[in-house]
């Protein structure tokens, strides 16, 4: 166990490729970061109430030169309490908006566009065609994008994401 956690904070990508199994998945409900990484990249974005904050942290992690280790050696139990959840359409709207903010901040424009198309369709499907909520979400998204700091992942970070088969298109 210590061995796995020790490798989680390693800045050398080659170490993962040559010595340890590597998976590109990152779960928001169970993760560990080295303190130095959080000091370097910052913590959760304060305007993310729910959804996609793990993507924001993982892209910041890659930009800082770290690798992400996913291991099946650790068990996390994540209980979802339906009494503590927002209505489904609100939850879907937050996820759509937050995902787009994260992609806008970290990925090249091509991926911003493909995410917008795919997540628009997904939101409209999951919300049973809630057009009014869709347009309100887009207006809120555009307001947040005006103040979000855009700092796109560089070529080596993008290559890393492609190497680990990260989900870039949607």
Regions found by a protein language model. Give the residues of each.
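Short loop segments at secondary-structure junctions
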Residues: 35-36, 64-65, 106-108
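Non-transmembrane alpha-helical segments in soluble domains
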Residues: 58-59, 100, 139
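Catalytic donor-sugar/metal-binding loop of nucleotide-sugar-dependent glycosyltransferases
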Residues: 39, 46-49, 55-77
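Catalytic-core region of carbohydrate-active enzymes that cleave or remodel glycosidic bonds
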Residues: 96-101, 106-110
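Activation segment
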Residues: 41-42, 80, 103
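Non-catalytic, C-terminal membrane-associated alpha-helical segments of glycosyltransferases
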Residues: 94, 110-170
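Acidic/His-rich active-site region of diverse nucleotide-sugar glycosyltransferases
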Residues: 1-42, 46-47, 55
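Nucleotide-sugar-dependent glycosyltransferase catalytic core
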Residues: 77-97, 132
């Amino acid at each position: 166990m210590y061995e796995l956690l020790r490798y989680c904070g390693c800045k050398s990508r080659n170490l993962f490729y040559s010595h340890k199994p590597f998976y590109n998945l990152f779960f928001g409900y169970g993760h560990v970061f080295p303190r130095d990484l959080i000091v370097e990249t910052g913590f959760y974005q304060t305007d993310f109430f729910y959804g996609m904050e793990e993507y924001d942290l993982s892209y910041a992690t890659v930009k800082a030169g770290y690798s992400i280790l996913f291991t099946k050696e650790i068990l996390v139990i994540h209980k979802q309490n339906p009494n503590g959840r927002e209505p489904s359409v609100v939850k879907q709207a937050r996820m759509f908006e937050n995902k787009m903010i994260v992609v806008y901040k970290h990925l090249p424009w091509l991926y911003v566009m493909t995410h917008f198309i795919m997540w628009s369709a997904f939101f409209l499907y999951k919300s049973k065609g809630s057009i009014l909520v869709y347009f309100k979400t887009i207006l809120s998204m555009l307001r947040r994008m005006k103040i979000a700091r855009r700092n796109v992942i560089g070529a080596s970070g993008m290559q890393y994401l492609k190497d680990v088969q990260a989900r870039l298109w949607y």
